[in-house]
Every structure is written in C-alpha cells, then in structure tokens.
C-alpha cells in the first residue's frame, strides 16, 4: 500500500451508518478511542502492518456484531486484504456470499468511468448504506483505501476543492 509520497504510506477513511436508534448508541472502538454519534475517521499509517494492527480489531468487532463491511481496496492488494481479514478469523468467502462483506476495487468505486467524481462517489456510499439497511444489517462499516488520491488521476484535484463527509 505504498503511495508515491514517502511520508504517507497508507490512508484509510471509515464511515458508519446505523439502521436503528439503539445501534447508534453502541460504543464503537477505533484504536484507543471510542467514537461518538457522528463517526468518521481519517487515518494515516506508516506501513501495512501498522494499518492492519489498527484496523483489524475495528473490522472484526463489526463482524462479531453482525454489521455489514464495505471495503474499497487497491486492486493489486485485494488478495492481501482478504488474507489479513482471514488471519483474525473472518470467513471472507462466507461473508461475501451472505452479503456481510462487500469489496470493491478503486476503479469500481472512486474511479468509475476512469475519473473521480465526488457526486457519484457519495451516491455510491448512500446506495451501499441503504443496501445494508435493506439487507437487515444494524450498521455498515466502510473502510476505504485512499492511496489512489496521491497519484495523477483525472478528477483527483476535486478532492481539494470540495469537502464533504
């Protein structure tokens, strides 16, 4: 997950949507913090090992609670991401089959039609969150790898102009 910038190796964004009032009251742990009612985290990591040391407990907790997981990953690291999830006891095959785990590559999320379009990305997130509710999951945890934003990609400068989430 090494990006072009030597000081920023990996970045993640995590957001959540609850399906019911009781779910929004449950504490959610991320690293050494408890997240409040409005939950969004942007984290930068120095290495993949550091990234997964922080993310895996957070991800596993969601699976144990029966929450949906939506992960956007570097396509070159998809298999490694699944291996890391499996290393903490998550049955990724079963989770994908029953809809608890949904994985998308950058090109199928951030970079649809070959460029970043913030409005389309936000529409996708809304769609995924609504889908999680319709499937009966109490909460959807979104983990999104953002290293692509450090590359020269069409639309990447729109991240600087617009600030949403």
Residue ranges of each PLM-predicted region?
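Long, charge-dense
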Residues: 81-125
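Elongated alpha-helical scaffolds
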Residues: 120-123, 127, 135-149
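Conserved small/polar residues in nucleotide/adenosyl-binding loops
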Residues: 164-165
